[in-house]
Amino acid sequence: MAASEAPPFWWEKPDWRAWALWPLSSAYGFAASARLRAAKREKIPAAVLCIGNLTVGGEGKTPIAIALARHAMRKGLTVGFLSRGYGGSHFKPHIVSPEDDSARAVGDEPLLLARQALTVISRDRAAGARRLVQAGCNLIIMDDGFQSARLHMDYALIVVDAMRGLGNGHVFPAGPMRAPLTEQMRFADGVVTMGEGDAADIVVRSASRAGRPVYSARIRPRSRNGLKGKRVLAFAGIGNPRKFYATLKACGADIVLERSFPDHHLFTEEDVSELSREAAKESLLLVTTEKDFVRLQNSMQPMRDFAASVQALKVEAVFDEPGAPDAIINAAQQAWRERMLKR
């Protein structure tokens, strides 16, 4: 379930709805914890760096994954991305083609990742990792999959939105947590808080008590975008569209209309026709996220035609600590080397 599809009370202080679901939440949390503890994860002959989160929905994992991949490639490593592929139709490991694959077939995030490095989607993450090793990758960056029980992770980096944090702190279905915090932190090697805010403080304290490093990062536009003073219709189908709108405003854009869709939304002809009409009526510039843009581009012809009239806001994740990417990648490689020596 995506954050934008989640019940609003998940992101508010706990109320009667959360407490009414507590029995189900407790059972789910117990099962999730047991699965994490009992997992028999396959170990492969390459370092595996997982970029995960503690809750459902978007926290900024993909920009962090791309930032670390770029740094690793500058170090001379051969990087491959591994993703489950949201809503994808492939049952076996599949190498993503950013030109030929559709968002419906492979998912939007894999299309973005494939523009940076070799990307494999696989419902069986261990099988997908083996495919990347066969292709010569010596560092596998797994976008999501922290709770997966199939693949051994040499380093698990948890991404937390500093503004939303853990929501009401309850485990699904009473809240957005995928498992209890203390249980998940047992398997984390580091934490990065995204953006400004203090909602992630509980995670920071938990990481500090466990002796895990904590980093901070933020999203910024990759280049000058010409949006200052422009009247725009901003639309997005991502986990947390408010972050996108806030970034647009920080660029100086005048957001006249906002249109939010569910996360990973596959736009229809009706959607794009309505957006075009609304923008034309007020003479507004259509602006969306990179994820939404690739979903439009890698779709049917009406959506591709519409994409030609849309500007994508290109962003990147930047660590506040200049040495953070190196520290994370080095830790993943060191853990892998130690693992290989024990074979």
Swiss-Prot record:
**Listed Pfam families:** LpxK
Q: InterPro entries, per this entry?
A: LpxK (IPR003758), P-loop_NTPase (IPR027417)
Instruction: Give disulfide pairs as residue numbers.
Output: none
List the SUPFAM superfamilies hit by this protein, alphabetically: P-loop containing nucleoside triphosphate hydrolases
> EC number(s) for this protein?
2.7.1.130
Q: Which reaction does it catalyse?
A: a lipid A disaccharide + ATP = a lipid IVA + ADP + H(+)
Q: What GO CC annotations are associated with the protein?
A: plasma membrane
Q: Does the keyword Kinase apply?
A: yes
- A single Gene Ontology molecular function, please? ATP binding
Which EC main class describes this enzyme?
transferase
Q: Which residues cross the membrane?
A: none
In this chain, ATP is annotated as bound at 55-62
* Keyword ATP-binding recorded: yes
Write out the pathway annotation from the protein's UniProt entry: Glycolipid biosynthesis; lipid IV(A) biosynthesis; lipid IV(A) from (3R)-3-hydroxytetradecanoyl-[acyl-carrier-protein] and UDP-N-acetyl-alpha-D-glucosamine: step 6/6
Which keywords appear in this protein's UniProt record, sorted alphabetically?
ATP-binding, Kinase, Lipid A biosynthesis, Lipid biosynthesis, Lipid metabolism, Nucleotide-binding, Transferase
Which GO biological process categories is it annotated with? lipid A biosynthetic process; lipopolysaccharide core region biosynthetic process
What job does the chain carry out?
Transfers the gamma-phosphate of ATP to the 4'-position of a tetraacyldisaccharide 1-phosphate intermediate (termed DS-1-P) to form tetraacyldisaccharide 1,4'-bis-phosphate (lipid IVA).
Q: Which NCBIfam families match?
A: lpxK
Family assignment from sequence similarity? Belongs to the LpxK family.
- Name of the protein: Tetraacyldisaccharide 4'-kinase
What is the species of this protein? Chelativorans sp. (strain BNC1)
